[in-house]
């Protein structure tokens, strides 16, 4: 059995196991390495989050053994006390691999059906990244935020190639809610980009292979409001065309065609349509390439879609209590124009040949 399959099997068993740590009371516990701790939600346990972000799959067995219990399918783990934190680096490993539930894709917010675009609430999309660009004539100014992305590991952000190819792109901000206010309760992380990995077959100005990965200069510290999204690596997701599903898209893009970007993080839910229907919609546009490497989502009547500034952001599918990224915002006609769905790079088409190798 491969390492990935072993990990998946290991995590799948957690829900059926009794707690593996010794729990002395409702709060106190003993960690797998015999340190005193308290049972907390994994999203607020900094030592285990640090282990997860730096050691990835290598941390899986220790994390599995740290489970105290589950509450509403959310793992409660034995979090070491402050004096025990020097022992957190127990495991070895520095490869960045796709994380699996429950270590990704968890949102603090219950998402009901969104029938129209609306502002997101704090903690709803902890993996959403705003991409920052330098002003060519005045690099000292604050970044210009004009593309989106998603955190997929502690060092990698997934985005669109047509965003990554711009020379002025240099920084990402993750976990923000309002890009200009500091009183929104968010605690965003802003980290510069070390390198850009653009799909080798992408050609500037052409809509094919519109996908890229940004490697950051340092680890992103996971927290309650900064957390990665899951990639659709399981077979039941890889082999799904997602037609008639209603995924979410979120970003700080324009609210109208050629309008200014939104300061507030906005979200909308859109239905995935067939590629045949999508191809017919874009038949008169020679530059539109609707192939099996993209998926399309939107309403026939228009009015709800990703827009300028949302480019590179994630199309997010909820499965039970976990969100998976199934698309990357690529292009559309105007902004939520009637008869023209949004076109997204299909993540499952690029997992093995591009995304996973680029994360190593």
From Swiss-Prot:
Q: Which residues form the Peptidase S1 domain?
A: 114-360
UniProt GO molecular function: metal ion binding; peptidase activator activity; serine-type endopeptidase activity; toxin activity
Q: Which residues are glycosylated?
A: 108
Signal sequence range: 1-26
Q: What class of enzyme is it?
A: hydrolase
* EC annotation from Swiss-Prot or TrEMBL: 3.4.21.-
Keywords (A to Z) from UniProt: Blood coagulation cascade activating toxin, Calcium, Disulfide bond, Fibrinolytic toxin, Glycoprotein, Hemostasis impairing toxin, Hydrolase, Metal-binding, Protease, Prothrombin activator, Secreted, Serine protease, Signal, Toxin, Zymogen
- On whether Calcium is a keyword of this UniProt record, the answer is yes
The active site is formed by 162, 210, 311
Q: What does this protein do?
A: Multifunctional venom serine protease. In insects, it acts as an arthropod prophenoloxidase-activating factor, thereby triggering the phenoloxidase cascade. When injected into larvae, it induces a lethal melanization response in target insects by modulating the innate immune response. In mammals, it converts fibrinogen into fibrin, activates prothrombin, and also degrades fibrin. In mammal, it may act in a cooperative manner with the serine protease inhibitor Bi-KTI (AC G3LH89) to promote the spread of bee venom under anti-bleeding conditions.
Q: What does the record's miscellaneous section state? A: Negative results: does not activate plasminogen.
Please give the family membership noted in the entry: Belongs to the peptidase S1 family. CLIP subfamily.
* Name used for this protein in its record: Venom serine protease Bi-VSP
